[in-house]
Design a protein with these regions (language model features):
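Terminal amphipathic alpha-helical/low-complexity segments used for targeting or macromolecular assembly
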Residues: 1-61
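Beta-solenoid/beta-rich acyl/carboxylate-transfer cores
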Residues: 68-80, 84-98
Length: 98
């Protein structure tokens, strides 16, 4: 299930962004996608008794993507952060599907 959600995250630009121009474009030009994927890992560890590891992953992701998502936040499926720089999502936030 976890990897299926990651695959969905990687496919969102193609589905939702008219400026999408290929997978390499996602790799280099979509920090929101990478912030979300990093969050999925951080959230997993944060909610499985490894809060410290979730916080470390979240901190590194914040530095690399300029997107600050607390590892305790809940983010649904099929979410796409276009132009994500500067997004801040707190620990108690719940972002639904789609």
């Amino acid at each position: 299930m976890f990897w299926k959600i990651i695959k969905e995250d990687l496919s969102q630009p193609k589905k939702q962004d008219p400026a999408y121009s290929g997978f390499l474009d996602v790799v280099f030009n979509y920090p929101g996608v990478w912030a979300l994927i990093n969050h999925r890992f951080a959230h997993f560890f944060f909610t499985h008794d490894l809060k410290w590891l979730g916080r470390i992953i979240s901190g590194i992701s914040r530095i690399l993507t300029a997107v600050d998502i607390h590892p305790g936040a809940t983010i649904g499926r099929n979410v796409f952060f276009d132009h994500a720089t500067g997004i801040v999502i707190g620990e108690t936030a719940v972002v639904g599907n789609n």
